Amino acid sequence: MHRPNFRPPTPPYPSPGIGGWGGGNNFRGALGGGPRPPSPRDGYGSPHHTPPCGPRARPYGSSQSPRHGGNFSGARFGSPSPGGYPGSYSRSPAGSQHQFGYSPGQQQTYPQGSPRTSTPFGSGRGREKRMSNELESYFKPSMLEDPWAGLEPVSVVDISQQYSNTQTFTGKKGRYFS
């Protein structure tokens, strides 16, 4: 289907096997203008290459293709450890990023989500009625008033006199300051 518009492989793709992909190379030349950006179209979007990019990328990508070479550099770092810890810190394939990208997100989601679903007032239905009953049983109306409303301003002289009186009255300076 894409053979009339087919171009020979560009210099970063010297292998004849990569040129055999046909429609994918045509997509690269027509859309991206370069070999790198539309290359995911070969693995995901191209109708001629429905197999996943794994079998195709392993023989060719490690040496010739710059895109797959970048991916495999992360895979090489991640291969010594099964969890892919070093691969997650470098530019790595999406697999090791998903391991660390989604699991912390889920851990953050559960503590944030659980208080919303299970509030101290029960479920969301009828919450206003139950909240008013619990407020009346736990709190007195005097607690809802401002406790600092009756305060009056005090000068600094009064405070210093008060502290000097209490210190001489208690006589426990040595207990706190040695």
From Swiss-Prot:
Keyword Cytoplasm set for record: yes
A single GO cellular-component term on record: cytoplasm
Residues recorded as bearing Phosphothreonine in the entry: 50, 119
Cellular compartment(s): Nucleus; Cytoplasm; Cytoplasm, Cytoskeleton, Microtubule organizing center, Centrosome
Chain intervals with Polar residues compositional bias: 97-121
Record-linked InterPro entries: MPLKIP-like_vertebrate, TTDN1/SICKLE
GO biological process entries: cell division
Bias (Pro residues) ranges: 1-15
Modified residues (Phosphoserine): 39, 46, 79, 81, 92, 103, 114, 123, 132
Record's comment on post-translational modification: Phosphorylated during mitosis in the cell cycle probably by CDK1.
Main location class: nucleus
Low complexity: compositionally biased ranges: 78-96
Residue positions, PTM Asymmetric dimethylarginine: 36, 58, 67, 76
Region annotated Disordered, chain positions: 1-134
Omega-N-methylarginine, modified sites: 56, 116
The entry's keywords: Cell cycle, Cell division, Cytoplasm, Cytoskeleton, Methylation, Mitosis, Nucleus, Phosphoprotein
Reported function: May play a role in maintenance of cell cycle integrity by regulating mitosis or cytokinesis.
Subunit structure comment from the entry: Interacts with PLK1; phosphorylation-dependent.
Protein name (record): M-phase-specific PLK1-interacting protein
Protein's gene: Mplkip
